[in-house]
Amino acid sequence: HLIDVWDATEITAIDPDPYYDYQVARPRVRLTEDGKRVIDWPTTRIFLADPPGAPNSILLVQGIEPNLKWKNFVSELLDIFDDYEVSLIISCGALLADAPHTRPVPVTTVAATPELTENLDLEPSAYEGPTGIIGVVQDEATERDIASISLWAAIPHYVSSPPNPKATLAVISKLEDLLDISIPLNDLIDESRAWQEGVDQLSAEDDEIKDYVTKLESSVDASDLPEASGEAIARAVSYTHLRAHET
């Protein structure tokens, strides 16, 4: 979404050969308008954007979690960040949660260091265990004195297939607060409404899911839906890995 609304320009891409197992992350064949076959390889692309109202340019990173050589991958990515004098990294993702699709999507903000956690008045994470590529990026960013924050939208595990425009909308709202800018939504509000109506219809046709959603709604309404903890986020990331829903 951000690549489109900010009219971002691709400036580079990381060579996928050292980092991806193509039997796991398979390349895809597509046809161009003139009927030519083109292979799209799984990789990470970096775009440059100049959002209206932003004091600085913004790099947007779009890709999927690599299968191999994470340390080298992260080092190569952050070398690009260093070339552009990046001072803050904001990672966006989603986690599966016991959250009903009928309620606002909770978004949790997690900072990479205790100092940043305190400065932003965030809930500290005491999680220890497996992590995803975002955790490795944050660790290396800290070593390079680059501030790092991650935003996680809690999406219903019973309707986890992408895209989820309602979750995207919630993450963008958080980004607007963090960056203190207005981000165009274009068709995102209509897409979010259509997505929820579609899930409403599906759940109405399945009594088991309908009852389950009702129970989730009651639980959420009773507790005002506290945001997911950093530990829950890390557990979800270790299970789902980094998903290519970058904004």
Q: What does each model-found stretch correspond to?
A:
Residues I64-P114, V137:
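Internal, conserved structured core segments that host functional sites
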Residues E10-I14, I181-S192, I209:
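Flexible, glycine/charged-enriched surface loops at secondary-structure junctions
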Residues T240-T247:
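Conserved small/polar residues in nucleotide/adenosyl-binding loops
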Residues N56-N67, N119-E123:
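Short, basic, glycine/proline-bearing loop/turn elements
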Residues H1-G63:
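N-terminal short beta-loop-beta anion/metal-coordinating cradle
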